[in-house]
Regions:
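Glycosyltransferase catalytic domains, chiefly GT-A lineage
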Residues: 1-196
Length: 196
């Protein structure tokens, strides 16, 4: 993202990288004021089986000589606040992927836990990136497991957008297969917050 901003001559102090399956509430406070210039992330608060499997397997495959990332320090890759001081780190991440893409692709089908989030957690630890863990309200994730998505025939609570009261940035990940998929929730939330 830094390359894109630089190429287009856009000046910035900090930038938020957010996943495409998220919606930001229009009244969200200015989270840039909370980073102290550090790498801003939100701890992953979702399926810990997935997290620990990913940490163990990617650790064994790619980082066998490194300490395992602690699950309670593991952040969700869908919210990253960075600034120009992080450009060398992101270049190292790009170089790491370029140098290891065959191994990553080989292990991806076996691990089945994504190819970005855990690797960047390891690289953040290895490079000793000064990180600030921000409140979960800035990456409210795994909404289904938190009983924040009403699924007809499954949910006992009212069919309303409960998550709007629980955070500022809504991450529609880890939704089980059903007619109310990511597209449904993103469209419904967008219309609720921003109108048609």
């Amino acid at each position: 993202v830094h390359d894109i901003l630089q190429h287009n001559g856009i000046e910035y102090d900090q930038v938020l990288i957010v996943d495409a399956d998220t919606i930001i509430h229009p009244d969200t406070p200015n989270f840039f004021n909370e980073t102290d210039g550090k790498f801003g992330v939100v701890r992953n608060n979702g399926c810990y089986e997935w997290v620990t499997r990913s940490i163990d397997n990617w650790g064994n495959a790619l980082f066998p000589n490194e300490s395992k990332v602690k699950p309670w320090k593991y952040f969700n890759g869908g919210f990253q606040i960075t600034n120009k001081s992080h450009i060398p780190f992101y270049k190292d991440v790009q170089n790491y992927y370029s140098s290891n893409i065959q191994t990553i692709n080989q292990w991806n089908d076996k691990i089945k836990a994504g190819t970005d989030q855990t690797i960047i957690n390891y690289l953040t630890q290895i490079h000793n990136i000064d990180t600030i863990y921000m409140d979960e309200c800035y990456n409210l994730q795994d909404l289904f497991r938190k009983n924040l998505l009403h699924i007809p025939g499954h949910s006992w609570f009212n069919d309303e957008l409960h998550f709007l009261k629980a955070g500022w940035i809504y991450h529609f990940n880890a939704i089980p297969k059903n007619p109310r998929d990511v597209k449904y929730w993103m469209e419904r939330t967008y219309k609720e917050l921003y109108g048609n």
